[in-house]
């Protein structure tokens, strides 16, 4: 931006015009130069402090007001603004100390409110409550403050009533609407929460078109709106983050990501900790390296979202970075007791132990599972009693309690089973699942994993169908919402139990849905039917029928521009490498026409695979593959060279 030239005598008018238009950054640019010339200028410092405060830059605002309190100790307002700026900058001890300088009776109520807010920020809720109770009950903030304290005590319904009561008195306020939505979210009443969120967003769009809501999602390139006081007062950032959290909980992952891109645009360095955390979490599948960097960065900030610590550790375990998880736990022992529940700590401890002492880990998981089983039995009894007494309110609460305990039990059970799964001891995995039958038989994750373990045992395809079928039928009208590997395993199970018609019908259904999507979006790659055919081809190759199996694999990747991807190449190359191994051992002979077909296939992969990654590298991998080697083109050339060598065609 070129330097602005302002005529003498127009400085004040220009600066005030900028402030009126909300151009605080431009005003700061001019005022900073003025302050450098006149370091004790009351006007420059006062306006700078005001602009910094409105841009939510509380640290710089506090510096301005600190100087003003020293230059003009008689002005009570500067002392108040200094304390408020320190509070905004999360410098709670300094903010509390500065409130004691407020000695004017007119600012006494403001001082009490600020001290209560500081105690609340320090998580001293009893101290905050003592101060709030000193406020007159007719004060509009009294119920709001009590609502916040009730929320922290887990009294979500009572907190909600306080916020609603305040809204009736004060009229509509976005921050109160957000507080009500947050209470409903905590009560798992997502529809009610979304209703209040929708109103915040609709009002934001209507009243503040300059905030560019939804523009980023639509692909429009817009400049950052910055962290202004206006943005803060709209509660839009909080509302979009809460909407993203709800959609994420409901497993509507695309909608969750859209909620984050719909919020008013800001540059990455302007993002608040909650948005940064949610971006990391919700883009983890596509940008895991960035996700880990953001979460690790947040741990160094003060404050950071309380769930950051646990989420970073869980994600390290998910991506099998157990050493990193152990290091983070060891280096942040002070955070362990504050941010991890006993359940989560024990779960993470067992996960990390798995790598060095699987038997010890199994024992830890078993102990944890035992505690949760006891809780499930206790809550089951409470559910039965509530049903018997026709106590609908208690029944609703106990069913919710049961679901919460079950959601803790399932990961423990799966982690326990994975120890034996990794050893390919599938019968033991089946026994572990059988033990949990009474609690988990209606849970989709449990049913899916039971299906997988039955499928892996070769002689239990019929039983596997019994678990796969309900999952597929549940989503039959939107069959592409089902994982491709589930559809593939069900088709294989049908084939292995001579139910070829059912397999063909399922494949026709998948093909029909894929054709519809291709019609609506011709450039979109869809791999479901391709993976089903690849798995069937792999099955025939595993049974030694390479002629048919390889032919099926080749046909499944046509057309290559739509079907060749990292996952599909993974399945295809396994079949070709298995074929080459058996040919090299002289265990099978291939007809020349089939060899020719294989060479042509690899040449097509070479042609279309230039921009397709051969493997997805681990996000925190230090020794990265050469970019030219991690392509389908490179690997298909290698396999083609092996074909020439094994068949002698290059001689």
Swiss-Prot record:
Coiled coil (UniProt feature): 494-521
Cleavable signal peptide: none
InterPro entries noted in UniProt: TPR-like_helical_dom_sf, TPR_2, TPR_rpt, TT30
Summary of the tissues where the protein is detected: Localizes to the cilia of many ciliated epithelial cell types including pronephric cells, olfactory placode, the brain ventricle and lateral line organs.
Gene Ontology CC: one annotated term: motile cilium
Keyword list, A-Z: Cell projection, Cilium, Cilium biogenesis/degradation, Coiled coil, Repeat, TPR repeat
UniProt-annotated location(s): Cell projection, Cilium
Pfam families: TPR_2 (PF07719), TPR_6 (PF13174)
Listed GO MF terms: intraciliary transport particle B binding; tubulin-glycine ligase activity
Domain of life: Eukaryota
Keyword Coiled coil: yes
GO BP, sorted A to Z: cilium assembly; determination of left/right symmetry; establishment of planar polarity; intraciliary transport; opsin transport; protein polyglutamylation
Disulfide bonds: none
TPR repeat segments: 8-41, 42-75, 140-173, 175-207, 379-410, 411-443, 445-478, 530-563
Main location: other
PROSITE patterns, A to Z: TPR (PS50005), TPR_REGION (PS50293)
Protein family membership: Belongs to the TTC30/dfy-1/fleer family.
Role noted for this protein: Plays a role in anterograde intraflagellar transport (IFT), the process by which cilia precursors are transported from the base of the cilium to the site of their incorporation at the tip. Required for polyglutamylation of axonemal tubulin, which is a prerequisite for correct assembly of cilia and for normal cilia beat amplitude. Does not seem to be required for neuronal microtubule polyglutamylation.
The protein's name in its UniProt record: Intraflagellar transport protein 70A
């Amino acid at each position: 931006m070129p330097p602005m030239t302002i005529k003498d005598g127009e400085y004040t008018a220009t600066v005030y015009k900028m402030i009126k238009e909300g151009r605080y950054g431009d005003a700061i640019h001019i005022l900073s130069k003025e302050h450098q010339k006149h370091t004790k200028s009351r006007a420059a410092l006062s306006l700078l402090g005001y602009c910094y405060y409105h841009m939510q830059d509380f640290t710089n605002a506090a510096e301005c007001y600190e100087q003003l309190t020293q230059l003009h100790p008689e002005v009570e307002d500067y002392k108040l603004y200094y304390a408020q700026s320190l509070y905004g900058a999360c410098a709670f001890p300094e903010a509390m100390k500065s409130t004691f300088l407020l000695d004017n009776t007119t600012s006494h109520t403001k001082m009490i409110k600020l001290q209560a807010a500081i105690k609340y920020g320090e998580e001293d809720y009893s101290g905050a409550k003592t101060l709030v109770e000193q406020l007159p009950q007719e004060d509009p903030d009294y119920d709001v403050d009590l609502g916040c304290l009730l929320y922290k005590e887990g009294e979500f319904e009572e907190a909600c009533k306080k916020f609603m009561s305040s809204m009736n008195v004060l009229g509509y306020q976005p921050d109160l609407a957000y507080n009500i939505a947050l209470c409903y979210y905590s009560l798992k009443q997502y529809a009610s929460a979304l209703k209040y969120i929708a109103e915040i967003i609709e009002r934001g769009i209507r009243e503040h078109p300059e905030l560019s809501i939804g523009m980023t999602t639509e692909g429009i390139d817009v400049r950052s709106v910055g962290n202004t006081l206006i943005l803060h007062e709209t509660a839009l950032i909080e509302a979009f983050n809460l909407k993203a959290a709800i959609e994420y909980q409901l497993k509507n992952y695309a909608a969750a990501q859209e909620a984050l891109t719909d919020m008013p645009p800001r540059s990455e360095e302007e993002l608040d900790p909650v948005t940064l955390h949610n971006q990391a979490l919700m883009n983890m599948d596509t940008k895991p390296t960035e996700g880990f960097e953001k979460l690790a960065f947040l741990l160094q900030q003060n404050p950071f979202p309380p769930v950051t610590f646990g989420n970073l550790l869980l994600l390290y375990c998910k991506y099998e970075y157990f050493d990193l998880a152990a290091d983070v736990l060891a280096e942040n022992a002070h955070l362990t007791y504050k941010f991890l529940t006993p359940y989560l700590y024990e779960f993470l401890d067992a996960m990390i132990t798995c790598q060095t002492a699987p038997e010890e880990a199994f024992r830890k998981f078993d102990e944890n599972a035992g505690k949760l089983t006891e809780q499930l039995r206790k809550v089951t009894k409470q559910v039965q009693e509530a049903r018997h007494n026709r106590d609908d309110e208690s029944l609703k609460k106990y069913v919710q309690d049961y679901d919460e305990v079950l959601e803790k039990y399932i990961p423990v059970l799966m982690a326990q089973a994975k120890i034996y799964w990794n050893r390919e001891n599938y019968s033991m995995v089946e026994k572990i699942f059988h033990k949990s039958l009474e609690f988990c038989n209606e849970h989709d994750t449990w049913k899916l994993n039971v299906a997988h373990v039955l499928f892996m045992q070769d002689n239990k395809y019929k039983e596997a169908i019994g678990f796969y079928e309900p999952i597929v039928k549940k989503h039959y009208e939107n069959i592409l919402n089902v994982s491709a590997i589930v559809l593939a395993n069900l088709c294989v199970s049908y084939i292995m139990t001579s139910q070829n018609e059912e397999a063909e019908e399922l494949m026709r259904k998948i093909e029909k849905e894929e054709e519809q999507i291709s019609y609506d979006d011709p450039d979109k790659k869809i791999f479901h039917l391709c993976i089903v055919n690849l798995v069937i081809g792999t099955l025939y190759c595993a049974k030694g029928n390479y002629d048919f199996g390889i032919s099926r694999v080749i046909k499944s990747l046509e057309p290559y521009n739509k079907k060749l991807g990292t996952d599909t190449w993974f399945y295809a190359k396994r079949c070709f490498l298995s074929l080459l191994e058996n040919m090299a051992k002289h265990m099978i002979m291939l007809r020349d026409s089939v060899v020719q077909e294989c060479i042509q296939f690899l040449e097509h992969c070479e042609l279309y695979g230039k921009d397709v990654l051969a493997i997805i590298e681990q996000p925190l991998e230090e020794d990265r593959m050469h970019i030219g080697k991690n392509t389908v083109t490179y690997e298909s050339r290698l396999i083609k060279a092996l074909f020439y060598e094994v068949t002698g065609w290059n001689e």
